[in-house]
């Protein structure tokens, strides 16, 4: 309701605010996912640190204090005394006291994206709670086709720029692409690679802050969804189609998971962490492999892990340098981890030793099959070489898969399920197989 603005309070407007706030609090106060009520977005910070607010009348600043530090907390206590009220975001507790202080309250961080900083910049910050950060991407082909003709699908066309409301952001996306990937071959590939970058950016920040559990108690990325079909920070587009980020978020926000942390970007030294943000002790096996692009194992080890409730720890420091000494091997090698609990892989990930644009990808030959079970279709995908960020899509259907944008790191391939309820009509395994399409990074240039 209140964001990045200045309000002139009078008796009529005050009554309007109180009525609308009460209505909305009552409307959703029963939701189990409700964590807190926040008074506004970036308004306290704006008064404190944004020069453009300095010229406003002192009355407006007094009105801010009355609305968000007096009226709304009193109202929330009356209609929902079970849920905490936080004055603003970011905030250090109110009264314009350094609202974006990195050591108190919550923080918004936009140097990655708005200031073109690399993803690695996230690791220089140890916020208490990062409540806003983000990275843009284009929507997929189906959504692009909904608002543009083929001849308009150039990111600098009038149509594409009108569907981008963040200034020179299309140029910014291309700048980030150039840092990590080769030039994509067409608009569909540009959109795909932009979504991979969005996933990688947010994952880089989230996993760093999760490794510092205790100091940093959480993060919220900007943003969930869109109000129209557009290039944006959303992880779900206007039509409800999941971008790569939303599948990634399902993985990197898992309660029980592993992460890989290089000593520095592209280092051969990697620390493997276990994260248990559940209420129970967890026992698992962490398996780490170094493979080449043809799935040959160069090194393998595993470790039995016991993680107490809400424990995060470095369980396996590794240096792969001895196995990467052969000329060109860094361009062909992949470090993979799998966290296995009760015989099931619950978390997995990969690390490259060069930027993806320098990795020596081979063109994959994919094999896809579909089997039907009671309530799901089981999709099996494999390939003859390492595959990075494989995306499965179905022509003619919009479905949410169990997982997507995954790596293939062995001849065994990957098994993905899709609930039959995702399809509008009854379909057969043969029809699903005929509609399936797969692509990966190697196909994008």
Task: Show which residues each predicted segment covers.
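Active-site mouth of glycoside hydrolases
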Residues: 1-84, 89, 96
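Substrate-binding clefts and catalytic carboxylate motifs of secreted carbohydrate-active enzymes
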Residues: 37, 74-77, 87-96, 104, ...
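Short hydrophobic alpha-helix segments
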Residues: 231-232, 301-303, 349
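Long, low-complexity ectodomains and other extracytoplasmic segments of secretory-pathway proteins
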Residues: 242, 251-260, 345-375
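Beta-strand-rich binding/interaction modules
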Residues: 268-306, 312-317, 333-340, 379-382, ...
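Terminal connector regions
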Residues: 284, 317-364, 421-445
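Intrinsically disordered, low-complexity Pro/Gly/Ser/Thr-rich segments with frequent PxxP/GP/PP motifs
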Residues: 285-329, 397-426
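C-terminal accessory/binding modules appended to enzymatic or scaffolding proteins
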Residues: 361-410, 414-419
